[in-house]
């Protein structure tokens, strides 16, 4: 990646506030930990379906990647689908079959479904391996695709599900699942979690944590008032807070200031608002 001009100025080895999901930089709040524990329990106990809801920018994608890695480390067969807007149930089914290592697929939907079921049986029932599919941005799944997923989590032995499914989704999924036609799917959810916005204390802790990872243990340059300003403008959203912190570093570097005060954060936030316009800012967060 390109060297950022402010890294040396602030004594950083890496970019502290990148919005690219990275497990190393992911700060686990109590709420993230709870969602992680509940979801890991559903998967580990092979109970089937877990859902994690949250607004955009609350850390769903980071948590999805962290869970995926945790499952791989535990020896599970885990697959992560990050953009599930498939045109047909058949295309989603073929993707899932390939991702989970099904030896072959069939021309027909029914054929592929049977092959996947046999594969899941061999892995989960015979070999005793936990098989898990994690889907990020699951709010884009149409009802016909949700119906396919319901079929897949119906595959079971006498005491456990063959496939464990974890959905990470924006709140639209709640509305979709409220439809009477999806009552069957909804009733399969074993545990649901919701990621909320950060508190001011959590934002303080997140900035401190990320700066320590990027600097090798040093303290960040934001005053307490500057952190409060980031909190106010980001409204507790982790992604927006990281963007504001990053932009503030750049401006502080240009002004050759080693300490970052609230007025600098305010001007960065103002500049961001004016350049994005409110509508674009909302679109940008999508």
PLM feature spans:
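C-terminal alpha-helical "lid" subdomain
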Residues: 5, 212-286
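Conserved NTP-binding/hydrolysis module of P-loop NTPases
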Residues: 12-17, 76, 87-106
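Walker A/P-loop nucleotide-binding motif
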Residues: 45-67
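Conserved AAA+ ATPase "SRH/arginine-finger" region at the nucleotide-binding site
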Residues: 81-85, 176-177, 190-203
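Mid-core helix/loop region of P-loop NTP-binding domains shared across ATPases and GTPases
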Residues: 7, 88-92, 103-148, 156-161, ...
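Conserved AAA+ ATPase "sensor/coupling" helix adjacent to the nucleotide-binding pocket
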Residues: 98-100, 171-172, 180, 198-217
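Short regulatory helix/loop adjacent to the ATP-binding pocket of P-loop NTPases
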Residues: 68-71, 173-188, 197
């Amino acid at each position: 990646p390109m060297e950022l001009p402010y890294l040396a100025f602030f004594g950083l080895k890496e970019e502290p506030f990148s919005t690219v999901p990275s497990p190393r930089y992911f700060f686990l709040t109590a709420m993230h930990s709870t969602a992680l524990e509940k979801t890991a329990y559903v998967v580990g106990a092979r109970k089937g379906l877990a859902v994690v809801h949250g607004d955009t920018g609350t850390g769903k994608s980071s948590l999805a990647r962290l869970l995926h890695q945790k499952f791989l480390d535990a020896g599970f067969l885990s697959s992560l689908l990050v953009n599930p807007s498939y045109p047909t149930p058949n295309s989603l089914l073929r993707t899932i079959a390939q991702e989970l290592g099904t030896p072959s697929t069939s021309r027909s939907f029914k054929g592929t479904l049977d092959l996947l079921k046999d594969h899941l049986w061999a892995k989960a029932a015979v070999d005793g391996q936990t098989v898990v599919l994690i889907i990020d941005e699951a709010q884009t799944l149409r009802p016909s695709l949700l119906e396919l997923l319901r079929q897949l989590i119906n595959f079971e032995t006498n005491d456990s599900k063959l496939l464990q499914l974890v959905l990470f989704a924006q709140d639209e999924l709640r509305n979709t699942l409220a439809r009477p036609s999806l009552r069957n799917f909804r009733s399969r959810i074993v545990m649901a979690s919701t990621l909320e916005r950060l508190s001011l204390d959590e934002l303080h802790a997140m900035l401190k944590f990320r700066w320590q990872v990027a600097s090798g243990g040093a303290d960040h340059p934001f005053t307490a008032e500057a952190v409060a300003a980031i909190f106010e403008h980001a409204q507790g959203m982790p992604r927006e807070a990281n963007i504001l912190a990053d932009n503030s570093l750049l401006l502080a570097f240009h002004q050759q200031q080693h300490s970052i005060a609230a007025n600098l954060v305010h001007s960065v936030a103002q500049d961001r608002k004016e350049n994005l316009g409110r509508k674009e800012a909302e679109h940008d967060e999508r």
